[in-house]
Every structure is written in structure tokens, then in C-alpha cells.
């Protein structure tokens, strides 16, 4: 198998993947799993592939690892960004792949991954121009320029993890709205019977330009010592949150 794969060009394999995905989508057997009955969920996920003790090429990423004796060593590695389409809870397949490259000395690893994501989204839009998509990812992608790319350039929706370190003014604005009882609250959600909150168009309070609807989920659980822990999640989305879709949005975002 490896022998034949080595003989094929990446473009050839990419075209084969595209035909397989389009065939599955046209079959309509996964339509019921679309978000809000419309959007295909596409998850961005970075994965490390190859590690080297010496620099392999100009595009190598670099990290430091502390050894057992306390010494630090440099490791060079290649990382790939995958866009995976969720067809069902059991079926998640690759939609596109892009290498994360070290473009310049002064560019951070986060910027390298964001730039790779932008290249990857462009490829996906070209391959599937009319596919209704909701892009999902961690807090790295919760940047206004990336949201604008998804919503305004490609006309897609998005759900990203929200962290204070990524969108501090947004987080503060949401907390201010929540303290003023401006958020909607629903209890008994999901398997844990937790509590959900949401507020739409928080960007109007935060002074942002991109659509930022915030929703969160909280539930209680016990650790191995039977001590109660509170687990919290918070997300940001371009999709309008309602009482009817909050649980589906939480299950999707998790």
C-alpha cells in the first residue's frame, strides 16, 4: 500500500478524498446530523506528525523539552492542520489538510497555525463552494479577523471556545451582562442535567465588529476523592442562540 501511495501525487489523493466526501453528502443519509438541520460541522484540529533532534528544513517548528535530568533540549517538528467534517457521532472524516509551517523567525506558533487555517479554509471553499458549513475550533481561532474570514468572506458560521486570554473585553462584557441578569438561563440540560446561559450580540457591548453570541454550560461532578467539582465551558458563535437550540449548541460545541 505504501509503495503505491508514494507514487501518487498529493493532488490526486486530495481529489479522491473530495469525491468520497461529496458522494457521502449527496447520499443524504447523514443529513439528520447537521447542526440546526442545516450546517455541516467542520472541526479544525492540529496534530504533530514528525519530530527531529536536528532542524529538518526551513519550515520546521521548534519547541523545548525538559528531560528527566533537568536539561532542556530543542526538538524540531512538523505539524499538520486537519479539517474534519462530522457526519455523525461515529463518522468523522478528513475534509482537508494543510501543513503548519514556520514562515519567519519572529512568527509565533499560534500565528503559523492561524495562517495554515486560512490557507486550509480557502481550499475547502474552492472544493465545496456551496456547502453550508459551521467551523469549530479552540480559542486560538476566536480572533476577529478569522471570524470575519469565516462569516463575511466565505459565508460560513462558526463556534469557537471562548477564553478570557483571547477575547478579554468580550469576556468582561459578557460577565457584566450576566451580573445584570441580561443572560437567559436554562437548567436541566444534557446528560449531566447542568445549567446553560447565553447572551446574543455581546459585540455591541464589547465594541467589537464581528457577531459574538456567547453561551456557556456548567455542571457538577465528583472526583476520585468524592469531592464535588464544577466543570465550566464557554463558547462564542455567529449563530443566534435561543432557548430551543441551546442544548444542541452545547452538545455540538463540546
Per-range role (PLM):
Residues 1, 38-49, 83, 117, ...:
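Short, conserved catalytic/metal-binding motifs centered on acidic residues
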Residues 64-132:
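Electropositive, glycine- and tryptophan-enriched low-complexity nucleic-acid-binding patches
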Residues 159-253:
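An anionic, glycine-rich sequence signature occurring as long contiguous blocks
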Residues 2-89, 101:
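Active-site-proximal, Lys/Arg-enriched surface segment
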Residues 50, 92, 167:
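Flexible, glycine-rich phosphate/dinucleotide-binding loops
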Residues 85-87, 99-101, 139, 160-164, ...:
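Short, structured patches in soluble enzyme cores that scaffold and shape functional sites
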Residues 107-169:
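Domain-level cores of phosphate- or acyl-group-handling catalytic modules
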Residues 56-59, 148-152, 173-175:
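Short, glycine/charged-enriched secondary-structure capping and boundary segments
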